[in-house]
């Protein structure tokens, strides 16, 4: 897709060949007036899918249900019944303004999709600091007159719109007590429309005995069977680059490595432990025939094309937040459970909890921790363990 910004409009040359394809909407926060609503670098929002279709001379964005039931019976009548009962609703419509000279693309103004304030496209994660672990709900109201499009860009598989968004936010404690009302919030956000795989990955049923991140589905498995609840495991599409060598039992690299980039704002002394913690998972992948699946790099210094806020880029970011843990955000293809992006946020206050946990667990037997400041060796071990856990979550565990 090609995208243009002209006088505040967002003109997209939408390929006719892309009609009917599934796309994912995602958001990334670049900077904000309140990091408690979402940390810079954090991918927020929900895994909303859109499918674009033509109705007369109008391009419409349909939004399939995230939890559309599946039909494992193979019964054509059940399939038709499910389709009739779950036809995706129209989320936005766009008047076709022109066609490209070769008629291969439709020109539409998509400003209404990117500059809108519904819960489906807002960039703020539910797990941010102002949510106080779920006790406080926040209602964000977009102020369109105080918001603007800053720039647009496109890559091979997605288009991006950078915008400055202003909101008023209401904070409600436990659904009953109004803590704050109309709190002003302004954030620079990149919103992205990403093309999902044309050939969906084969789903894998999750086993409840294993600790996996899952996607809940209802299964209509036949007229004589009850409707069952099943779960798809969220997992990466790890495929061997050399199938013949893989079948011979040799270790092979995957077609696509999982590359994490370390934030340039991260304390430099942490970087070796972050790299060691993330790449420690490669030992597990070797048990199933893969090597060098996970790779950790620092932000490139002289690469003008590198964009840490792109959906194609997985990052390990540093956040000046009181939250006391590492947070992992996963974006997946809700049709199959395929993980498409996993990014990690290291909150500054994580160190305090690591200190308290290590003191409580080992102070009786380890004299090295009987101090107010841990030695670098111990602090590094704790950071390495926290990163290994966060990356494990990003792998779907």
Which role fits each region the language model picked out?
Residues 1-266, 284, 288, 299-354, ...:
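Auxiliary tRNA-acceptor-end handling modules of aminoacyl-tRNA synthetases
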Residues 266, 270-272:
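Ordered core of a single globular domain
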Residues 271, 377-378:
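A generic secondary-structure micro-motif detector
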Residues 276-283, 337, 381-397:
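Active-site recognition of the HExxH zinc-binding catalytic motif
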Residues 294:
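Conserved structured catalytic cores and adjacent interaction surfaces
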């Amino acid at each position: 897709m090609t995208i243009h910004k002209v006088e505040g409009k967002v003109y997209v040359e939408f390929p006719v060949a892309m009609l009917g394809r599934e796309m994912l909407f995602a958001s990334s926060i670049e900077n904000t007036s309140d990091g408690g609503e979402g940390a810079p670098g954090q991918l927020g929002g929900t895994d909303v899918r859109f499918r674009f279709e033509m109705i007369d001379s109008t391009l419409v964005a349909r939004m399939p249900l995230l939890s559309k039931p599946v039909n494992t019976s193979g019964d054509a009548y059940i399939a038709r019944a499910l389709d009739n009962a779950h036809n995706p609703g129209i989320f936005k419509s766009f008047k076709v303004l022109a066609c490209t000279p070769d008629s291969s693309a439709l020109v539409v103004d998509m400003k209404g999709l990117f500059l809108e304030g519904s819960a489906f496209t807002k960039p703020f994660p539910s797990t941010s600091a102002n949510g106080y672990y779920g006790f406080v709900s926040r209602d964000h109201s977009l102020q369109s007159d105080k918001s603007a499009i800053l720039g647009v860009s496109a890559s091979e598989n997605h288009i991006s719109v950078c915008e400055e968004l202003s909101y008023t936010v209401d904070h409600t404690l436990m659904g009953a007590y109004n803590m704050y009302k109309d709190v002003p919030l302004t954030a620079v956000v990149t919103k992205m429309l990403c093309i999902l795989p044309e050939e969906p990955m084969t789903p894998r049923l999750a086993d409840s005995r294993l600790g996996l991140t899952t996607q809940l589905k209802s299964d209509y498995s036949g007229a004589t069977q009850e409707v069952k609840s099943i779960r798809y495991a969220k997992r990466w599409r790890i495929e061997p680059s050399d199938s013949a060598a893989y079948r011979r039992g040799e270790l092979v690299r995957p077609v696509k490595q999982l590359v994490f980039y370390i934030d340039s704002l991260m304390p430099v002394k942490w970087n070796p432990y972050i790299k060691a913690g993330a790449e420690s998972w490669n030992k597990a992948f070797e048990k199933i025939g893969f090597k060098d699946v996970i790779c950790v790099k620092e932000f490139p210094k002289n690469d003008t094309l590198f964009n840490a806020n792109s959906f194609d880029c997985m990052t390990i970011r540093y956040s000046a937040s009181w939250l006391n843990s590492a947070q992992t955000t996963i974006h997946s293809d809700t049709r199959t459970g395929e993980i498409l992006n996993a990014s990690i946020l290291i909150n500054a206050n994580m160190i305090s909890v690591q200190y308290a946990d290590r003191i409580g667990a080992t102070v009786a037997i380890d004299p090295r921790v009987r101090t107010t400041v841990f030695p670098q060796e111990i602090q590094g071990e704790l950071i390495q363990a926290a990163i290994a856990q966060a990356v494990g979550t990003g792998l779907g565990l």
